[in-house]
Regions:
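A general structural signal for well-ordered alpha-helical packing
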Residues: 3-6, 22, 29, 44, ...
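A conserved FAD-binding loop/helix module that cradles the flavin
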Residues: 10-29
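C-terminal helical "tail/cap" subdomain of flavin- and related membrane-associated enzymes
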Residues: 30-126
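Short FAD-binding loop at a beta-strand-to-alpha-helix junction that anchors the flavin cofactor
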Residues: 1-13
Length: 126
């Protein structure tokens, strides 16, 4: 079982390494205990898929930081406080909160939001 940065190293700037190390180690230890008790453990489903979903979500945000997407969102003319809260929640490590649309739809949500901001700001300039 790989845990922490061995699972996936994303970026040296963000603090995701500590969060992923903690969550992956905690989950792995629970699954090892189950396995030692001869209980069934599906490592792909119970561990890999769960951790992978969190890593994929956070990777979207690391990429968005470096390509300017997050800057465009945070410094738009009329930032929506609720959207900023939802995005900051992801950056704080809540990458498994499926109630948050910026987790659930992370692969497309940020790009849609930037397009909406661009259109809104173009229309407001008329």
């Amino acid at each position: 079982v790989l845990t922490g940065n061995v699972t996936e190293f994303l970026d040296p700037i963000f603090s995701s390494g500590v969060m992923f190390a903690t969550v992956s180690s905690q989950l792995a230890s629970k699954l090892v205990v189950r396995k030692l008790k001869n209980e069934p453990v599906d490592w792909d489903n119970d561990y890999h898929d769960f951790i992978g979903q969190g890593v994929d979500t956070f990777r979207t945000y690391v990429t968005a930081w470096y390509d300017g997407t997050l800057e465009r969102i945070f410094f738009s003319k009329n930032p929506d406080p609720e959207i900023k809260r939802q995005i900051c929640s992801v950056l704080a490590g809540y990458v498994w909160d499926q109630k948050n649309p910026y987790v659930r739809d992370h692969a497309v949500a940020l790009q849609r939001l930037v397009k909406l901001i661009d259109v809104s700001e173009r229309l407001s300039s008329f």
